Amino acid sequence: MLSKTSIVILGLLCKGEKNAYDMLKMIDSMNMKYWLPIGATTLYETCLRLQKKAFIEDSGESQAKAIYRITDKGKQELKNTVIALFNQVDYDTVWFCLAVMYSDILNKEELNTAKQKRAALLDEYEKGTKQNRDIMLQHKVPYSAICAIERMIRIVEMEKETLSKL
């Protein structure tokens, strides 16, 4: 599976060719720094790694700087990663955000299948999490021990709402 930075780069390149500086400007304009900080060095190094894996290539349009474009292999890897992210529940909610942001790489059938699988996972996860919370409440466990579980229930509810609107 791709790293978070790789997902962002490939997702941005799905929209068209860009150099690293333009990608950094786009990331900044999306206010990603608050939930997924990507510095210049990380972006440049990740571009080089993606190029070595043949997920992106230099278009050769500029002598002064690399202008990257996504390859078919890169599109397929991004698609596989987005599908994999829909099929897992993670405490790190950035993964789901990235899956949603770049879900337009999926065709309608792939997206619907991914959404259905995600919804089933969330239903199962929510049920188990609520049962755990209820047991803790029955045993009069202090709220400080329950608050993380409450947070996860809210996250599941928000993700379900997101899926319904996607």
Label each region the model flagged.
Residues 78-81, 129, 166:
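Hydrophobic recognition helices of helix-based DNA-binding modules
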Residues 1-90:
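Basic helix-turn-helix/winged-helix DNA-binding cores
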Residues 130-148:
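Acidic interhelical loop/turn segments
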Residues 112, 119, 123-126, 133, ...:
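Heptad-repeat amphipathic alpha-helical coiled-coil interaction surface used
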Residues 81-127:
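Amphipathic alpha-helical dimerization/coiled-coil segments
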Residues 7-11, 98-101, 147:
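Positions in alpha-helical segments
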Residues 19, 23, 46, 125-129, ...:
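Amphipathic, well-ordered alpha-helical segments in soluble domains
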